[in-house]
Design a protein with these regions (language model features):
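N-terminal domain-start motif of subtilase-like serine proteases
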Residues: 1, 37-43, 61-94, 117-128, ...
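Short, surface-exposed ligand-recognition loops at beta-strand->loop->(often short) alpha-helix junctions
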Residues: 1-10
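Autoinhibitory propeptides
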Residues: 9-81
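Subtilisin-like serine protease catalytic core
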Residues: 10, 16, 79-114, 118-169, ...
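Sec-exported extracytoplasmic/periplasmic mature domains
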Residues: 16, 20, 47-51, 138-142, ...
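Active-site glycine-centered loops adjacent to acidic/histidine catalytic or metal-binding residues
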Residues: 96, 210, 234, 320
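Extracellular S/T/G-rich loop segment that most often corresponds to the catalytic His/Ser-adjacent loop
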Residues: 104, 244-333
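Active-site neighborhood of phospho(di)ester-bond hydrolases with catalytic His/Asp-centered motifs
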Residues: 189-191, 229-234
């Protein structure tokens, strides 16, 4: 890699060789980015290499229906037009822990189940978070009536949890989004993000990577269909400036949560929902959606479901922006279906879907 200084002079050094020599368990993420382990004793030696521009700790990523659809008026939207809106013809990508693909609510609509971290498994053995999230988007309710928002959409799943440890590992965001796009997904929903308080509100390299992909797919000159990307705002409220990365990205739909069941008005943020603004003054989250006590699919292999507030054989209840985000993703799926089938716009940009989702929401008249 040739790196030029202010005077135009360059130093020739291959960053991959530095990574190969300095790092254990080295992994090439994206162009100019490597991940791995090295001793703190080697820190100065690494940063002195001419091709190394910056270092940082690996960010820790965490996980951030019937009543939900009523709150979002989805049932009214589905039947308002001559053509019913149910997600038909749409592929939604869900990046999350894992998937119980054999849960009856997905039928034969799983078009891909991708293992993204190298542990050889796409199962959902711990909390069942990924199965719950995916079913909220597009489950058909065949096991007991808790159907998702877009029950005829197809699913491309990307598993990101290590079965052995339960740790959540984010692969390259460029690779994650590109893989889903190449599989036909045009909605990409993510109920996870950084749990580091030190980077809350910051526009990090992860946020930049997401914006890069969104911008690339939305460029009309590329002749490509747009990609709508959603991220959970996080569960670190009620203080301001608590939205984590990559939810701080400019082009994504950042989703907070309101109550979906029991007490609480839909126009009130739940206390734990992360608040904006971002460090550079942008409003986040962009929208709020039902995220309190959401009932959705229960992964049959899940072994750690003690945090759920209600359970049956096939369904359980979770709360958080993780639950709100797939509800919003389902709504985005119906919007995209509307644009293609009814408005006759065959390749809607992600920015257009985001704009209609935000402008179609009800103003709650408060940032709190």
């Amino acid at each position: 890699t040739a790196i030029a200084d202010a005077d135009g002079n360059t130093i020739q050094q291959d960053l991959s060789q530095v990574a190969g020599l300095a790092l254990d368990d080295v992994e090439h993420l994206d162009q100019g980015q490597y991940r791995g382990l090295f001793s703190s004793d080697s820190l100065l030696d690494v940063v002195r290499q001419p091709s190394v521009m910056w270092l940082r700790f690996e960010p820790q990523m965490d996980f951030d229906n019937d009543q939900s659809k009523n709150h979002m008026k989805i049932n009214t939207m589905r039947s308002y037009f001559t053509t019913d809106l149910d997600g038909s013809g749409q592929i939604v990508a869900v990046a999350d822990s894992g998937l119980d693909e054999d849960h009856g609510d997905f039928g034969t609509r799983v078009v891909g189940n991708y293992e993204g971290i190298g542990d050889g498994s796409t199962a959902d053995k711990h909390s069942g978070h990924g199965t719950h999230v995916a079913c909220t988007v597009l489950g058909d309710g065949s096991k007991g009536g808790y159907a998702g928002v877009a029950p005829d959409a197809e699913l491309y799943f990307q598993a990101m949890e290590n079965d052995n440890t339960g740790n959540f590992v984010s692969p390259s965001l460029n690779y994650l989004l590109n893989t889903a796009y190449n599989a036909g997904a045009r909605i990409h929903t993510n109920s996870w993000g950084s749990s580091a308080t030190s980077t809350q509100g910051e526009y990090t390299s992860e946020a930049e990577a997401v914006d890069d992909r969104s911008f690339n797919y939305d460029k009309v000159s590329n002749g490509q269909e747009g990609l709508t990307i959603l991220f959970a705002a996080g569960n670190d409220g009620p203080n301001p400036g608590t939205v984590g990365s990559p939810s701080t990205a400019k082009n994504v739909v950042t989703v907070g949560n309101h109550q979906a069941r029991y007490s609480g008005a839909p126009d009130n943020l739940m206390s734990g929902s992360s608040r904006g603004p971002t460090d550079d003054g942008r409003i986040k989250p962009d929208i709020i959606a039902p995220g309190g006590y959401v009932r959705s699919c229960r992964a049959q292999e899940a072994q750690d479901i003690g945090s759920s507030s209600w359970q049956s054989t096939w369904y359980l209840e979770y709360t958080g922006t993780s639950m709100a985000t797939p509800n919003a993703a389902g709504a985005a799926t119906l919007i995209r279906e509307y644009l293609i089938e009814i408005a006759q716009r065959p390749s809607p940009q992600g920015a257009l879907v985001k704009a209609l989702l935000v402008l179609g929401a009800q103003d709650i008249n408060s940032r709190d």
